[in-house]
Amino acid sequence: MSRIGKKPIDIPSGVEVKIDGNVITVKGPKGSLTKEIHPEMIVKIENNQILVQRPSDERHHKALHGLTRTLIANMVAGVTKGYEKVLEIVGIGYRAQKQGKKLILNVGYSHPVEIEEPAGITIEVPDQNRIVVKGIDKQQVGNFAANIRKVREPDPYLGKGIKYADEVLRLKEGKAGKGGKK
């Protein structure tokens, strides 16, 4: 058995799970998520828990087993708690602001970069140097945060740019090197 796949997923109170063939719908206090899973995976609801089983011990079935269980667990966590990614903007004159459903980034280009807020995602800008991306779909939140970061990735020498709040940057040394001038 897959170490991850064999663990049952507890269904918290207030969450409704519906299985229709290979389509799983999870409804909770924060919203509803629907995902199509691999047709070979067997998903059952027993004793207020979701169980994921695989048809055989073949290598790809083992991989799909853990993946399917994790995707369903992420859906349950998303509709109960939600997900958020925090980005920080580092650099003189670099800032973010929100206008309606648009995020406007001034990050050293000759023009401000405008990014539209997609459906299912909310953007908060608590101050000019922080962006908080929130949503119920873990993959969508992560992808959107990565797209914002891609606008101006952190510079490897100075660290200027957009980075995740928990990201640790290893800065390179300049041309002078360790010894400096001789």
Curated annotation (Swiss-Prot):
The keyword Ribonucleoprotein applies. One of its GO terms (molecular function) is rRNA binding. Gene3D superfamilies: Ribosomal protein L6, alpha-beta domain (3.90.930.12). One of its GO terms (biological process) is cytoplasmic translation. Signal peptide: none annotated. It comes from the Bacteria. The keyword Translocase does not apply. GO terms for cellular component: cytosolic large ribosomal subunit. This protein binds to the 23S rRNA, and is important in its secondary structure. It is located near the subunit interface in the base of the L7/L12 stalk, and near the tRNA binding site of the peptidyltransferase center. Part of the 50S ribosomal subunit. Keywords: Ribonucleoprotein, Ribosomal protein, RNA-binding, rRNA-binding. InterPro entries: Ribosomal_uL6-like, Ribosomal_uL6-like_a/b-dom_sf, Ribosomal_uL6_a/b-dom, Ribosomal_uL6_bac-type. Belongs to the universal ribosomal protein uL6 family. This is Large ribosomal subunit protein uL6. PANTHER family: 60S/50S RIBOSOMAL PROTEIN L6/L9, LARGE RIBOSOMAL SUBUNIT PROTEIN UL6M. It holds the Pfam family Ribosomal_L6.
